[in-house]
């Protein structure tokens, strides 16, 4: 068969395989188009679970007559025009594929009118070449899209549709998610002529909890803890259910949004789960409705056909920001304010200084130029004081080249109130969970830390060595071996070959796999920490070490390897130090409680402070 260009209808049907999975996919794409058009009211009519009819009507800006035909063409869109726009997407749609794909697998009619036009126009595509016909029609300002007989021309796809009830439940769930994303839009959903959902728009400063309760239920609303956590252009808002009262029914409520776009993102879910892990059982899941706002330049939404996933350029910082925001709310809930004097006074509940964990406490205070203090309040019941107006009708966007991420490493420590003198704890008490907050890098390989007002210096190469030893030491299961693309073949002596054969089982537990013959050994796999090392130097040194040993313990071999690994960083940065200490705290908690020699050294500032005061 010769190479040929596919007919437009066939090409659109192939694209529809990714965009149009079921009727709910059609509803999602069309409602998002309405939101991009600035609609404040959207009416959705469904018949037979969407298989017979999907009708979306909005009061948005409409489409001009001259652009109706283009609206049904592939890769035609008004939302982006250049590569710069693609790298900072602020609209929900941007590819220009949805209408063309939907019209290729259904009978689609598009009717629209702009405020400048005296009459509306209707367009539909038909035939093998998808030729568009435009004719006048009666319609108010806005757009109506009718999708009839979905998959009528692709029987195999139609056969895979579920029951009418199941398909409508999927549509209902999509509308729930969209209604939680846009409190400022009225959304009405009807099925087979009966109104099923009515979500009225919440006015500016109105009660979002009313819609939250209608969608997520009163049980979630009663346990919801409100979050507002901000640093520069990073903002986290929403609600998380109290983990102490989470039920299996509540755990099904997991909604997250990035710049107003509904997401199922593993990084966000992991950060929330990690913040709640101390209070959740092994088989429990947190319940949350969270909104993350981030500079569009720092997130890529063009990584999934249905746009369900995103990729953050600074994923570690986003993860720690979300983790700290959720953790602070949960910690604040457990706190009881202490009276400052004998008279009872109302104590405002403010967020304490973030848990001093490496890489997780740079969000304690907002950036200096934007002094917006994070706050925590339990979600009020309907009728209480108004909440802040979010999410906004139009997503706010400023073209900034990632300054927030540099500011994250320069955030000043929060000011502490003066308290009565208390007995000083050692720099690392037995109940400490963290080395402290990284202030700066000293002499290229030492981190200056602060915890509870105490200053200390930490050797980053030593911490890295302990981390590598923990990563190499086998636990209940052997260390995972990483096959080498090009196996390393080395010549060995009879003594070295004998030592390797005796140590083979111990090396296998460390993830080192090899084969030997008469005078050579071939290294086929090594553990992950060794992949970036110069194995032509390290492996011969390891063989020489083994030849001098009589007992081969995996722990001793792991210790030797860790001490002989070359550091990955000749000059450490703040971000690298933060990442390293976060990993050390997770994998080597014993080092926090009892740091070994050469790792941590306290710095006594009292002589310097005294000298300053005596001047």
UniProtKB/Swiss-Prot annotation:
For the keyword ATP-binding, the answer is: yes
The biological process GO terms on file are: mismatch repair; mismatch repair involved in maintenance of fidelity involved in DNA-dependent DNA replication; regulation of DNA recombination
UniProt cross-references to InterPro entries, sorted A to Z: DNA_mismatch_repair_CS (IPR014762), DNA_mismatch_repair_MutL (IPR020667), DNA_mismatch_S5_2-like (IPR013507), HATPase_C_sf (IPR036890), MutL/Mlh/PMS (IPR002099), MutL/Mlh/Pms-like (IPR038973), MutL_C (IPR014790), MutL_C_dimsub (IPR042120)
SMART domains linked to this entry: DNA_mis_repair, MutL_C
Q: Where is the sequence biased in composition, kind Low complexity?
A: 364-391
Recorded family membership? Belongs to the DNA mismatch repair MutL/HexB family.
This chain belongs to the protein called DNA mismatch repair protein MutL
Originating organism:
Escherichia coli (strain K12)
């Amino acid at each position: 068969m010769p190479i040929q260009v596919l007919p437009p209808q066939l090409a659109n049907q192939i694209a529809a395989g990714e965009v149009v999975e079921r009727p709910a996919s059609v509803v999602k794409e069309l409602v998002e188009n309405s939101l991009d058009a600035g609609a404040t009211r959207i009416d959705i009519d469904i018949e037979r679970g969407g298989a017979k009819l999907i009708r979306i009507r909005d009061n948005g800006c409409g489409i001009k007559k001259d652009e109706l035909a283009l609206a049904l063409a592939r890769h035609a869109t008004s939302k982006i025009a250049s590569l710069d726009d693609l790298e900072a997407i602020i609209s929900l749609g941007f590819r220009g594929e949805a209408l063309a794909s939907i019209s290729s697998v259904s009978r689609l009619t598009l009717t629209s009118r702009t405020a400048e036009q005296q009459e509306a126009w209707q367009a539909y595509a038909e035939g093998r070449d998808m030729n568009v016909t435009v004719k006048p029609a009666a319609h108010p300002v806005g757009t109506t899209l009718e999708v009839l007989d979905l998959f009528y021309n692709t029987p195999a796809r139609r056969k895979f549709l579920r029951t009418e009830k199941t398909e409508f439940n999927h549509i209902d769930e999509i509308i729930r998610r969209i209604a939680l994303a846009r409190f400022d839009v009225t959304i009405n959903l009807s099925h087979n002529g009966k109104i099923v959902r009515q979500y009225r728009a919440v006015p500016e400063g109105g009660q979002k909890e009313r819609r939250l309760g209608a969608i997520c239920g009163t049980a979630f609303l009663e346990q919801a803890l409100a979050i507002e956590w901000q640093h520069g252009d990073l903002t986290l808002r929403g609600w998380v259910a109290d983990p102490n009262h989470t039920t299996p029914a509540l755990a099904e409520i997991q909604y997250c949004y990035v710049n107003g776009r509904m997401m199922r993102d593993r990084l966000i879910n992991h950060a929330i789960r990690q913040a709640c892990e101390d209070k959740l059982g092994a088989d429990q899941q947190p319940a949350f409705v969270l909104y993350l706002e981030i500079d569009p330049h720092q997130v890529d939404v063009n990584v999934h056909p249905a746009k369900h996933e995103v990729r953050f350029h600074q994923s570690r910082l986003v993860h720690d920001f979300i983790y700290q925001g959720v953790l602070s709310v949960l910690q604040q809930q457990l706190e009881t304010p202490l009276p400052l004097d004998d008279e009872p006074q109302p104590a405002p509940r403010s967020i304490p200084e973030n848990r001093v964990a490496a890489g997780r406490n740079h969000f304690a205070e907002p950036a200096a130029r934007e002094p917006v203090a994070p706050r925590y309040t339990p979600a009020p019941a309907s009728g209480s004081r108004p909440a802040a107006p979010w999410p906004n009708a139009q997503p706010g966007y400023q073209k900034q080249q990632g300054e927030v991420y540099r500011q994250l490493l320069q955030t000043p420590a929060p000011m502490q109130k003066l308290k009565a003198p208390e007995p000083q704890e050692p720099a690392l008490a037995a109940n400490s969970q963290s080395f402290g907050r990284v202030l700066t890098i000293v002499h290229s390989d030492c981190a200056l830390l602060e915890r509870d007002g105490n200053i200390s210096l930490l050797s980053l190469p030593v911490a890295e060595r302990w981390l590598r030893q923990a990563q190499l030491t086998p636990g209940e299961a052997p260390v995972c071996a990483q096959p080498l693309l090009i196996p390393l073949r080395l010549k060995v002596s009879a003594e070295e070959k004998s030592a390797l054969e005796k140590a083979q089982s111990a090396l296998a537990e460390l993830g080192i796999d090899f084969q030997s013959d008469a005078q050579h050994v071939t290294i086929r796999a090594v553990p992950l920490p060794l992949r970036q090392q110069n194995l032509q130097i390290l492996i011969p040194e390891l063989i020489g070490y083994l030849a001098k040993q009589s007992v081969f313990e995996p722990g001793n071999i792991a210790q030797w390897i860790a001490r002989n690994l070359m550091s990955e960083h000749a000059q450490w940065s703040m971000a690298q130090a933060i990442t390293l200490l976060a990993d050390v705290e997770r994998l080597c908690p014993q080092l926090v409680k009892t740091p070994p020699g050469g790792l941590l050294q306290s710095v006594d500032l009292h002589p310097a402070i005294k000298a300053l005061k005596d001047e």
